[in-house]
């Protein structure tokens, strides 16, 4: 029988449970909740269906399609390590589609080219023994295939999705939709028999980094977040675009909302920022803004980290090695064997430049 979704836990409740922030900062929590917005309907049947199972040289997979609301669905690729015994830590990896995170074209089941090997987080994680939920994100799970095909070039898909979301869920921002749907992917992962529900995390790049940051801050099931070059400062990237916060951002900034305050709500849970282009030294004030909360929560010195590879938007392999060692320590795993990254790095370096 399909399960029924319960209303999303409010930030104020999460604050009380997690002890996040100081009393003076708690009024900001309600403003974060208001900023993200709420779906028009919160009482809907949770349904998921298994579309297919398959095996690749790197992992065993189950592709699900599940509801994220009364009118929207998402594809979630559950990636299981070969030879898994017992339960393993799990990581949700949100992005435009599962393909680019798992490293395979899901239609043909053939490997993707090596040009973006460093961003194939799902593939990296499953090779280390994690159970991974590679989740499809807004805007592609808001529009039909026909709507995507008819969208103008450039940012047409994004604008079309933002317009549609404004009609169907007028209070919900694009960032709110991204966050909500990532948490539904975490529902699926936490219920998977292969995953250890006490050792869960989010990891994402760019849009996936934004999503992982917000979902991880809200979701107490997540013990850690790794976010790559998403632009933690308001002026670092396009937070003002209609598909993130749109016109609502101006009021948020006027009210004094800063991401360092949202990060403080994660304390003492772990946060690792991979910086490269949109994050860097300009991001440190946000981490410093949260540091007092981490100290007050008794977090260890490694709980809040940034690695700035200074080599552009794509993560460097050096930064990934640091992030994966850190993640293993946060989720109670031994030092990971990352030798496979060297081969991926070699392949990427040898790939024709586009």
Model-identified regions with their sequence ranges:
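Bacterial N-terminal signal peptides that target proteins for export
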Residues: 1-9
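Bacterial Sec-dependent signal peptides at the C-terminal "C-region" and cleavage site
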Residues: 12-25
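Alpha/beta-hydrolase-fold serine-hydrolase catalytic core, especially in secreted/extracellular enzymes
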Residues: 23-73, 82, 269-354
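Proline/glycine-enriched tight loop/beta-turn segments at coil->beta junctions
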Residues: 69-74, 82-91, 97-100
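Cap/lid segment of the alpha/beta-hydrolase catalytic domain
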Residues: 87, 94-183, 191, 234-240
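Mobile cap/lid helix-loop segments that gate and shape the active-site cleft of serine hydrolases
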Residues: 161-162, 169, 184, 223-263, ...
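Alpha/beta-hydrolase fold nucleophile elbow
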Residues: 194-206
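Glycine-rich nucleophile elbow surrounding the catalytic serine of serine-hydrolase chemistry
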Residues: 204-214
């Amino acid at each position: 029988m399909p399960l029924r979704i319960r209303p999303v836990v409010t930030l104020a409740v999460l604050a009380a449970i997690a002890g996040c922030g100081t009393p003076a900062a708690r009024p900001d929590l309600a403003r974060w909740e208001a900023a993200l917005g709420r779906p028009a309907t919160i009482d809907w049947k949770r349904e998921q269906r298994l579309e297919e199972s398959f095996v690749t040289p790197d992992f065993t997979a189950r592709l699900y399609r599940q509801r994220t609301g009364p009118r929207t669905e998402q594809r979630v690729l559950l990636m299981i390590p070969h030879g898994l015994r017992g339960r393993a830590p799990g990581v949700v990896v949100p992005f435009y589609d599962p393909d680019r995170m798992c490293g395979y074209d899901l239609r043909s089941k053939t490997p993707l080219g090596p040009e973006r090997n460093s961003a194939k987080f799902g593939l990296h994680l499953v090779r280390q023994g994690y159970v991974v939920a590679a989740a499809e994100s807004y805007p592609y799970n808001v529009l039909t295939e026909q709507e995507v095909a008819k969208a103008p070039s450039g940012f047409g898909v994004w604008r079309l999705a933002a317009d549609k979301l404004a009609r169907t869920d007028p209070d919900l921002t694009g960032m709110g939709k991204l966050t909500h749907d990532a948490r539904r992917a975490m529902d699926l992962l936490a219920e998977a028999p292969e995953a250890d529900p006490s050792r869960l995390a989010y990891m994402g790049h760019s849009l996936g980094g934004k999503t992982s940051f917000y979902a991880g801050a809200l979701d107490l099931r997540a013990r850690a977040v790794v976010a790559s070059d998403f632009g933690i400062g308001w002026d670092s990237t396009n937070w003002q675009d209609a598909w993130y916060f749109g016109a609502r951002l101006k009021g948020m900034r006027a009210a004094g909302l800063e991401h360092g305050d949202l990060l403080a709500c994660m304390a003492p849970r772990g946060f690792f920022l991979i910086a490269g282009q949109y994050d860097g030294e300009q991001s440190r004030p946000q981490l410093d803004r949260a540091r007092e909360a981490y100290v007050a929560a008794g977090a260890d010195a490694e709980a809040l980290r940034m690695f700035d590879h200074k080599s552009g938007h794509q993560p460097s392999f050096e930064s990934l090695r640091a992030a994966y060692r850190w993640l293993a320590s946060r989720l109670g795993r031994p030092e990971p064997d990352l030798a496979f990254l060297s081969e991926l790095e070699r392949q990427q370096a040898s790939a024709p430049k586009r």
